[in-house]
Regions:
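Metal-cofactor-binding active-site regions of metalloenzymes
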Residues: 1-199, 203-345
Length: 345
């Protein structure tokens, strides 16, 4: 069997389906013309983004990312597709996988039925691929969800008997108007901690006033948690409980605070390059926080089906971005990164 990287801790379901699964699903749903259009767009995108120009990719190229997502959403239409899609993602992925998805009404199904289908996909994937482990995070979209939605997700995760849902994710379009911001964002983080649920938070994805404000709120909330937990737990209380996604656009003070807290950061190298968050002739922005692979850094694919990445590729790219002062072997690095998982193997 091909050597697989141990883990992928930043994987969004809808961006990670294989072409084979999407074609099969398009046949089932009678929309092969949509799949054909998706393949045309993917090929065009691949040709345009083989190598990053010095000034970065054009806006037209970046817009092809969002076009791919729109077409995927037209193909994946019902709860059966969600369940089968989870199995597909796990079958093409690494040995330990944390998949995120934003529950939604789909077809005639309710939000709760969506979550049940997501769970069933994880259960089936773990049964089929006994050499792997897949767990799920429920994503709160900061542009549509509220504190009450967070309570609902937390309640569902806590009462679920299956043990495959392990935490929350906060994501969503960083430049759109936000429904989860300020005090409400703080409340969601506090609710997760109060219920002993891990939380992954997308952060520093754009250079705006509200993003800077919310980043300060996130860092203050996790610092308060770290202080309150320090007397009860050996080691860093944030490890295995909190991960920060991307962390590209940050102030000097925010970078210093993350470094002080030793908060884990999810780095998705291909995604960062394709969105011009990292111009490859320059150092990666996260190296201004942590510059060595022995720091709390975790590679992720983000959207493997869209960006054409894989756990193995992202691990290698991530290594190339940071120093390795201690000359750690790959297995040592992977074991180190396993500390930041939200679930035990």
């Amino acid at each position: 069997m091909q050597q697989e990287h141990k883990s992928d801790l930043h994987c969004h379901l809808n961006g990670s389906f294989s072409d084979e699964f999407l074609e099969k699903t398009a046949v089932k749903n009678g929309c092969l013309q949509v799949f054909a259009e998706l393949m045309e767009v993917k090929e065009k995108y691949f040709q345009l983004t083989k190598q990053q120009p010095q000034e970065g990719f054009s806006l037209d190229s970046i817009n092809l990312i969002w076009k791919q997502f729109a077409l995927v959403h037209k193909i994946v239409r019902d709860l059966e597709d969600i369940k089968n899609g989870v199995v597909d993602v796990v079958s093409h992925s690494v040995k330990y996988l944390e998949i995120r998805t934003t529950p939604k009404e789909m077809g005639n199904g309710t939000i709760e039925q969506y979550i049940e289908s997501f769970e069933q996909g994880l259960i089936e994937a773990n049964q089929v691929h006994k050499n792997k482990k897949a767990v799920g995070l429920l994503s709160l979209d900061r542009t549509i969800h509220t504190v009450e939605d967070a309570r609902r997700y937390i309640h569902y995760i806590k009462k679920s008997p299956h043990g495959v849902l392990v935490g929350l994710d906060i994501s969503g379009n960083p430049i759109a108007k936000r429904t989860l911001s300020g005090k409400d964002l703080e409340k969601v983080i506090q609710l997760a901690f109060a219920n002993q649920l891990p939380i992954a938070i997308h952060m520093g994805e754009c250079d705006s006033g509200i993003e800077r404000q919310d980043t300060d709120i996130v860092l203050a909330a996790i610092e308060q948690f770290a202080i309150s937990e320090a007397r009860f737990k050996q080691g860093n209380p944030l490890h295995g409980k909190v991960r920060l996604g991307h962390c590209i656009f940050l102030s000097k003070e925010q970078k210093e605070k993350i470094r002080e807290l030793q908060a884990p950061i999810e780095v998705c190298p291909t995604c960062h390059s394709k969105l011009n968050w990292h111009l490859e002739k320059s150092v990666h922005p996260v190296t201004e926080i942590y510059n060595d692979i022995s720091a709390p850094i975790i590679p992720g694919t983000d959207d493997a089906g869209i960006f054409g990445s894989s756990g193995k590729k992202e691990f290698a790219k991530c290594k190339s971005l940071f120093f390795n002062k201690h000359q750690l072997e790959d297995d040592d690095i992977k074991n180190h990164q396993a500390k930041f998982r939200f679930s035990n193997p």
